[in-house]
Each structure stands twice: as structure tokens, then as C-alpha cells.
């Protein structure tokens, strides 16, 4: 009898880690993202690791998130697939190699100089979404040259002068072919991140002897800094005076940005943006349930890619994507999911779920 449940092999456009000749060698040393995290403080300066690894306050939120995710149990299902499944998906009319992408991040070049370029290049090579953050270190114009097929762009609320800067950024993104605009609604104020403050990441930024010594003790970081220069908020530089240094641009950002988008403001951005629009920051359980019911198609990660950068430099983002895609294919095979959409029907046990 013909087995209609068997899955055909991945199509030519579906990337797998086997396509990367460096994967096997890197995988021996760093088989998981956790291994990259352990190695990161040995390879990058201390202040860079504290900046990327910490959270708000005492890191209690990070611990709760880890515990909640670790408590999820996926019940295996066998006799469904005969090969490792393809994890390719179609989102907003585009095909991607996996249902994951690089989240928009602020200041990744503090973690590793040139970070935005390395992140964008890895996403373009592997074919997964790359969301450039407004306060990243690369302009949307430059990002479009590095990652023309996978570029998304994230905005915070630039409210002054009737959103003049925000609307101009939308114009710039549209002009260079950004595929998806992301509006962040879950950062109405900036919280205190204790570990980065103690490590010297403050505004205005004044590096001390301890930070300089840490850079000198990290030759890979020093080489990247020499090549790419100090971090800059490239997307916002055009709206400041030509002679503005990094601290002056940071002060400008604090004046221009703030608060969360209102729904009326989102509607105004929607009128100006003719392509897919994503609202980032859904936190309420009822809202999350609605998203799942409507069919959430992909997830974004941030810290994992920063751990990869801190541990491996330029090779880090690509190796993190390889790890995730490799693990995802194995997990889908174990739970009998022949494609990402099938994962929604898998039996899930979650005894550690937060109750509201």
C-alpha cells in the first residue's frame, strides 16, 4: 500500500546545516547554543558579555522564561516520517529555510564590532528573516545591500514633530525594498539593566581603564573594532548634526523616542507602509492565544545570536542558525511533524506554565 504519510526530501531551496562545510568542525566544539554562551566570556570583553547576557533588575525575568520554556514537553509520535523533515516555510509570500529569524536588537556591535553585518550576511546566506533594529549599527540602506532577500526593519516610536523621523524612516525602508516593517509596542520606557550598568555601559559612554584592558585582552574583538570602528546608531545619524559623536546621537535618541505606539499611530504607519506589517510585543495571554489561533508562523531569537557572536565572532550567527535548524529538524522528526504547520497539532504537556 502506498504510504501517503511519508515526506519527500527537502526541495532545492531548503537549506540544511550539511550545506555548510564548517558545521561539523564547529559542532564538535559547540553542539548547542548553551556551549556558545559558556565560551562567550572567554572570547569577548567582560563588558560585552554583561551587556548581552543580562536582563532587567536581578535577571529574574530571564530565569522565569528559561524555566517556563524548559517545562514544555512535546509528546513523540512515531511511524509518520521516514526522513528528517524540511522546516522551510512560506510567510508573507516569501519562502524561508526555517520558521525562525534574527530579532531586532539594540547595540549588537557592542557585543562584537560589525555584528549587524555578520547577522545580515548569515541570514541572507541561509535564507531566514533578518530584522534590523532601529538602534542597530547599520543603516537600512547598507542592510539592504547585504541582505536584500530577507530584510525586515524595526521601528520604535519616534513621536516628536508628528512622527517626522518615524515616517521618514518608513520612506527610506520602502525605497530600499525592505520586505516587512516591525513596530515595537512593548518598550514604553527603558528599564535598568543592572549588569550592564556595573560593567560600564552607560550613557554618556565613558570607557574606563578596566574596559580598555578587557578589549586589549580580547584580540579577536580588538581586530574587529579596528576593522569596523566603534558602534554607531547609523539609522539616526542623518537626523543629527554632521559632527555629532556617539554620545550626542544617543542623547538625541532619548529625546526623540519614547512611549508605546497607540493604535491610532499604528494606523498612520499602516497608511504609509504598503507591505506586510508586524506588531512586536504581544504579551497578554489572551492576545497570544489569538495569535496562535490565527496561525503564528515563525519565531525570532536575539540573545542566542549574540552569544554566537561573542563566542565565534563573524562565524557565530551562521553557526547558531545551523544549530537551531539541525535541532528543529530532529525535534520535528521525533514528534511526527512533516512540516512546521504540523507542530500546532502536537500534544504538548506544560506543567510549569504560568497561570494568570
For each feature predicted by the language model, list its residue ranges:
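Alpha/beta enzyme core
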Residues: 107, 120-121, 145-146, 160-307
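A gly/proline- and charged-residue-enriched helix-loop-helix capping module
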Residues: 124-166
